[in-house]
């Protein structure tokens, strides 16, 4: 029996509707909308598309989303000055610096300069540390948060489940594992250099794949009845957008699966909007 499809577009719309209602309550209580600043250095076509989408969708739910497009020649010092300005602006609740940055700019220096309370990408060491220690008050990266919402919408019981995360990036793999641990799953982190990766994946009740390798996971890598979350975004030889999972083969064994496109992607931006609202609420609550 073919797997059920976890429709990220539909669930993302549900999240956006919830955020829109929350923003309206925030404005009524505080007289201003939550503010999100997206900072872009240069004119990389993919980054331009992503940042404009974030700006547009923020404004659609009532968040004051603004894109700061800086020249490609921007120096690290100039970018740090921009971040410092946004840190000091009380109307800004969320700051997102679009990655990747030009090679001459140290990404860690820029990310570390963002006020942790405004770090809606969840990449500041303070937020990463709080998440790793299982302590409240931090901000988790948006893609793993979106994946957790997908699992919740599918009604997947995580407590006691065997979860395998293929990928170890700071943006997806590592925080995804921490969020699953917090829900009492038994978690293994793997990657493309893991020995016997196929055997490990076959043990997973929940498999989250963020390896960045097209169709890495085949149908015979999947435990019957598993839930498969495909975070990958790749182009095949024909230029078609595909995930890290061989969708047609895997859906014959899985119980639930996310498509690419239309699965995790829409949830990432929806989760960014939700995170921005939560950051705004947390900031005003501390005053």
From Swiss-Prot:
Entry keyword Hydrolase: yes
GO cellular component terms, semicolon-separated: cytosol
GO biological process, one term: tetrahydrofolate interconversion
Keywords for the protein's UniProt record, in alphabetical order: Amino-acid biosynthesis, Histidine biosynthesis, Hydrolase, Methionine biosynthesis, Multifunctional enzyme, NADP, One-carbon metabolism, Oxidoreductase, Purine biosynthesis
UniProt-annotated binding residues for NADP(+): 167-169, 192
Pathway field: One-carbon metabolism; tetrahydrofolate interconversion
Catalytic reaction list: (6R)-5,10-methylene-5,6,7,8-tetrahydrofolate + NADP(+) = (6R)-5,10-methenyltetrahydrofolate + NADPH; (6R)-5,10-methenyltetrahydrofolate + H2O = (6R)-10-formyltetrahydrofolate + H(+)
A single MF term (Gene Ontology): methenyltetrahydrofolate cyclohydrolase activity
Membrane as UniProt keyword: no
Assigned EC number: 1.5.1.5, 3.5.4.9
Pfam families xref list: THF_DHG_CYH, THF_DHG_CYH_C
Family: Belongs to the tetrahydrofolate dehydrogenase/cyclohydrolase family.
Oligomeric form and interacting partners: Homodimer.
PANTHER family in alphabetical order: C-1-TETRAHYDROFOLATE SYNTHASE, CYTOPLASMIC, C-1-TETRAHYDROFOLATE SYNTHASE, CYTOPLASMIC-RELATED
Annotated HAMAP family: THF_DHG_CYH (MF_01576)
Function: Catalyzes the oxidation of 5,10-methylenetetrahydrofolate to 5,10-methenyltetrahydrofolate and then the hydrolysis of 5,10-methenyltetrahydrofolate to 10-formyltetrahydrofolate.
Protein name as catalogued: Bifunctional protein FolD
Gene this chain is encoded by: folD
